[in-house]
Amino acid sequence: MTKPSDPTRDSHVAVLAFPFGTHAAPLLTVTRRLASASPSTVFSFFNTAQSNSSLFSSGDEADRPANIRVYDIADGVPEGYVFSGRPQEAIELFLQAAPENFRREIAKAETEVGTEVKCLMTDAFFWFAADMATEINASWIAFWTAGANSLSAHLYTDLIRETIGVKEVGERMEETIGVISGMEKIRVKDTPEGVVFGNLDSVFSKMLHQMGLALPRATAVFINSFEDLDPTLTNNLRSRFKRYLNIGPLGLLSSTLQQLVQDPHGCLAWMEKRSSGSVAYISFGTVMTPPPGELAAIAEGLESSKVPFVWSLKEKSLVQLPKGFLDRTREQGIVVPWAPQVELLKHEATGVFVTHCGWNSVLESVSGGVPMICRPFFGDQRLNGRAVEVVWEIGMTIINGVFTKDGFEKCLDKVLVQDDGKKMKCNAKKLKELAYEAVSSKGRSSENFRGLLDAVVNII
């Protein structure tokens, strides 16, 4: 990719991104902030061409800090390879080739920059970065893009397996994980696949297990969260790592940057006509879409409830909606292929967020003080949903885990109308205040970001 001209360099940081899901974007957000704070340090950002193309626009060079250089690495897919359709196949191919691909591109970047890399800042998934850092005499800074609960589940995988037993797990799914301080309300069935159930021998499961074993070797581990959200887990994790830093919510830290709000479908203008706390915002992220029957149930529940709504739904899924739904609800709500989520969750009219409970979405909802209705699918989403409902008490999981017309209607009524919903809103507002306090100039997340800057470039 085209690279900005370089000022004089004092140090060189290699940033290694995981190019799947929503991992690369928050790592780039952190990289931009660090680069702006340390203009004499070069940050070489390594990612696949496909992922980079979605992160950087053609005119991005003008806005990108001059000390960020962008490199494309191979995706690990052999020439002429035919995908079999196996789940996580692309991830497996990438991971198998990643260590050598990263080494090769880092060497190229060192030649171009004229400065050896002295810090590897990577997605925490890259357990092999521990050995890479040792090889080149560099520090390793790892970024966990999800929450403290899921990080703890992977850090303590061996302990959980020893306590629960992988063979007996089917009989113990409802038990809570009391053996880990801060996870006493988390059930076995809430843990991500690959901890004690699912395919423990998959490439992805083994990667997460190796990650949990390797992370204590890192110079520092940082996370997109804030300390008051999980204080007990924060203290626990701080005792396990050389340095553990909550630097989020990143969405609030980056809000100081002047960014033009993209709203091509007029969602925010539509919201201006709605009363405070009345609108249901519905989005399940960029990776998953509920199955057809659940999409129909959501539509039927919305129509029957009369609740105003903004629904972010891929165009290819519109055919799954009940016939005539869009026409009948034209005055009630809007269905759009993309919505400005952060701005919608900050809007006074938003009363509930119907979500898959991906970590970025949860944190954005917390930052907006908006209660949630959760429909988790995989990974850390069940953990996040459990925390939303039982730990923080700022929402609820959909009844019986899947959308039905009646179940969804009851959830909307509970959150938007009933006293339970008022309590959720109150709790969400308190967490919002703590989130903003954390990123204030003297807040803990701001202080931790300065600590991260120190760990990465040693300029303080």
Swiss-Prot record:
Instruction: Report the gene knockout effect.
Output: Dwarf phenotype and altered flavonol glycoside pattern. The accumulation of kaempferol 3-O-rhamnoside-7-O-rhamnoside in the mutant inhibits basipetal auxin transport in the shoot, which correlates with the dwarf phenotype.
Q: What induces it?
A: By PAP1.
Check the UniProt entry and state the signal peptide residues, or none. none
- Keywords attached to this entry: Glycosyltransferase, Phenylpropanoid metabolism, Transferase
- Which reaction(s) does the protein catalyse, per the Swiss-Prot or TrEMBL entry? a flavonol + UDP-alpha-D-glucose = a flavonol 3-O-beta-D-glucoside + UDP + H(+); quercetin + UDP-alpha-D-glucose = quercetin 3-O-beta-D-glucoside + UDP + H(+)
Q: Short name of one Pfam family for this protein?
A: UDPGT
So where does UDP-alpha-D-glucose get bound? T145, A339, Q341, H356, W359, N360, S361, E364, D380, Q381
**Do you know which SUPFAM superfamilies this protein is assigned to?**
UDP-Glycosyltransferase/glycogen phosphorylase
A Gene Ontology annotation in the biological process aspect, one of them, is:
phenylpropanoid metabolic process
| Record GO terms (molecular function) | anthocyanidin 3-O-glucosyltransferase activity; flavonol 3-O-glucosyltransferase activity; quercetin 3-O-glucosyltransferase activity; UDP-glucosyltransferase activity
State the protein's purpose: Flavonol 3-O-glucosyltransferase that catalyzes the transfer of glucose from UDP-glucose to the 3-OH position of quercetin and kaempferol. Possesses high quercetin 3-O-glucosyltransferase activity in vitro. Catalyzes the glycosylation of anthocyanins from UDP-glucose. Also active in vitro on benzoates and benzoate derivatives.
Its family remark reads:
Belongs to the UDP-glycosyltransferase family.
Could you identify this protein by its name? Flavonol 3-O-glucosyltransferase
Organism of origin is: Arabidopsis thaliana
